[in-house]
A protein has these predicted regions:
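Active-site bordering "gate/hinge" segments
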Residues: 1-251, 258-261, 267-270
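Dual-mode signal for accessory low-complexity, basic/Gly-rich regions
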Residues: 227-333
Length: 333
């Protein structure tokens, strides 16, 4: 019988903001342990929240093999333990730092109200298996999700400042928010000519589901049957990148580590890969993409973690005139 053991610890801080003021501060700590047992082409899973009894979880996972859930084992070895990142902000300094940020934003953009949340998290994940693998990764990040409301507007909000950062730089945040507000205050007519559109990959998330192996293999994807064909323009490359800053974890939930941390779905316009776990890869004769994720007590499934478009220009200025989509939502999406 073969085993996988995954341990995850996360400390999270959440600062709530309303009317440009810090209104609450919350801290939480989550710890989970997952054990997967493999035998005779089946998987058994056991998970625990909080401190775990590893022997009991192994026994429970072995017992759950009786459910007969088919899943390939295909374990591989390897050792890598990344060092922990530097602390972004000390716990005692989180609220003062964001109060100072909001005070400066209120002074420099006094016609606007800021709200919603700023989150800070530290995560450590370890993976080991009976084939000799032993991995540890750490992630420390700030998530800004600030709504911006024009005081003269009847809207609930008029803009959103969203950003994932790995260090706290107040001046940079203020500069970026003011740049966004300056653009909002300077409406221009939509150009008649065709221009590149610059946006976050999240804006096209519904299209990304067509890369999932189950959709591709079942014939439900727009890409079904087109593996190896050129279906996009020459400059389009889409890849899973598990290197910082795209994701802090170099391995996925199945312990897969891609060469150089990358796996291409589209390379120079050619469709060359799908988002495949070990099970879907075996089912549809596809390469494993290294993008598996799972709940602490669930079967692995494909995720979009680390998915990005490869840069075609060194910075926005090099791309020339373009339409920049900062935020989009609603039924028309």
């Amino acid at each position: 019988m073969e085993y996988e053991i995954i341990r995850r610890k996360e400390t999270g801080y959440s600062v709530s903001v309303a009317a440009s003021k810090v209104t609450s501060f919350r801290k939480n700590f989550n710890e989970t342990t997952t054990v997967r047992a493999y035998e005779n082409g089946c998987i058994g899973i056991a998970g625990a929240v909080g401190k775990a009894n590893l022997s009991a979880l192994k026994k429970e996972a072995a017992e759950s093999l009786k459910k007969g859930i088919a899943y390939p084992c295909n374990l591989s070895g390897g050792v890598r333990h990344d060092p922990a990142p530097k602390e972004i902000l000390p716990e005692s300094g989180i609220v003062p730092a964001f109060r100072a940020l909001l005070e400066e934003l209120s002074k420099k953009a006094d016609g606007y109200l800021f709200g919603n949340k700023i989150n800070l998290s530290y995560e450590t994940v370890s993976y080991e298996n009976t084939a000799g693998a032993s991995y540890t990764s750490h992630d420390a990040s700030l998530e800004y999700a600030l709504t911006i409301k024009d005081k003269k507007s009847a809207n609930i909000m008029d803009m959103v400042y969203g950003k994932r950062a790995f260090s706290y730089k107040k001046d940079a945040v203020v500069s970026e928010v003011l740049e966004m507000i300056a653009a909002y205050e300077n409406p221009v007519p939509m150009p008649a000519e065709k221009l590149p559109v610059v946006t976050d990959a999240g804006a096209v998330a519904p299209l990304l589901s067509h890369f999932v192996a189950e959709m591709y293999g079942s014939g439900a994807s727009l890409l079904s049957g087109k593996m190896g064909q050129k279906v996009f323009g020459d400059r389009v490359s889409v890849l899973v990148d598990r290197n910082p800053p795209y994701t802090g974890r170099f391995f996925d939930a199945e312990g897969v580590v891609n060469p150089e941390g990358k796996f291409y779905l589209v390379k120079d316009g050619v469709f060359c890969g799908a988002l495949a776990t070990k099970r879907s890869a075996q089912l549809f004769s596809l390469p494993v993409s290294g993008t598996a994720g799972s709940t602490y007590d669930g079967v692995p499934g494909a995720t979009f973690t680390g998915l990005r478009f490869e840069n075609t220009a060194e910075g926005y200025a090099a791309a020339g005139d373009a339409i920049f989509v900062v935020y989009a939502s609603g039924g028309d999406m």
